[in-house]
Amino acid sequence: SVLIMTPDCLIAGRDKFGRLPIHVGQDDEGCCVAFESFAYQKMGYHDAYELGPAEVVKITERGWETLLPAEKEMKVCAFLWTYYGYPNSNYEGVNVEVMRNRNGVSLAKTDREKGVAQDIDYVSGVPDSGTPHAIGYANESGIPFARPFIKYTPTWPRSFMPTNQKERDRVAKMKQIPVHDLIEGKKLLFVDDSIVRGTQLRETVEFLYANGAKEVHIRSACPPIMYGCKFLNFSTSRSPMELLARRTVYELEGEEGDKHLEEYSDPNTDRGKKLRE
């Protein structure tokens, strides 16, 4: 995406696939542009327009006009809703917090249909982005929501920001502070926003058992990740086999794994259901 400032206007262009959003806000005196729609709401602007893929618009105090029309193909980043989008923001007309709650509701319905994880003491989210998914799960299942560990954030960045995996793992681990009364002897179900390599997930489970948890169940709000993304540093990898879902497929299929990746990526196929189990 691109934003150009001139003496009399702004020119904004969204990337050709619409991977990331560009919003135009408007009030009685003019317009503004932002990546996150919540960025201008506290200043009195309201959502006025969202650019489509490859669309370019000219913005003045009187409004905006399209210089290049939007393309039809949209490939917006799903991780905006699942992980790194701000809860107050809307993308393509869908609020981030609402979408995360819906994901949790869907996970709870699936567990109910399968008859699994029905005697859990608490539903929890891997903070922060896992929390709204977990709240949706708790509301749908009727199981109480609790926070068995709290994330200490003042001295630590978001764990996906460091450029190497070792540092990402260290940040994630150091931020976790347990609430022992909510862990010891309890059956816990945690909802995480996604599972990429599985290293942080493993450390979270080990952390909970080390603090006395009786059972730990994990649910992922994001479908299995089979391919890395060149745009996101937390999903890039030296080898596709670093991705947990990809490794699991090879464990199930051996050297024939590559031939069935599409089937495992589709939740409606037998292989897709097998992977999730």
How does the language model describe each region?
Residues 8-10, 14, 21, 26, ...:
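PRPP-dependent phosphoribosyltransferase catalytic core
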Residues 13, 190-191:
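Generic enzyme active-site microenvironment
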Residues 101, 105, 109, 131, ...:
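Feature representing long, continuous alpha-helical segments
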